[in-house]
From Swiss-Prot:
<keyword id="KW-0533">Nickel</keyword>
<protein>
    <recommendedName>
        <fullName>Urease accessory protein UreI</fullName>
    </recommendedName>
</protein>
<comment type="function">
    <text>Probably facilitates nickel incorporation. May constitute a multicomponent high-affinity nickel transporter. Not essential for the expression of catalytically active urease.</text>
</comment>
Length: 65
């Protein structure tokens, strides 16, 4: 849990831009914290055109290293 939170905080700018681009503004609070950061799963691996893939949910879906 702690590692994931650290990762989210460490990459907050990347995640902020992803969330804004996908219209999931309700997950991002004005004070810079996630509403439910424990439910946000983030895959750090870059996809295609430098995009990042992430999931919203309670379980990881597909483990890719």
């Amino acid at each position: 849990m702690g590692t994931r939170k650290f990762f989210l905080l460490h990459h907050d700018k990347i995640i902020r831009s992803i969330i804004m681009a996908n219209g999931i503004k309700n997950y991002w609070q004005d004070d810079g914290r996630f509403d439910r950061c424990s439910e946000i799963f983030f895959l750090s691996q870059k996809q295609g055109r430098g995009l990042y893939r992430f999931w919203l949910g309670n379980k990881k879906q597909g483990n890719r290293d």
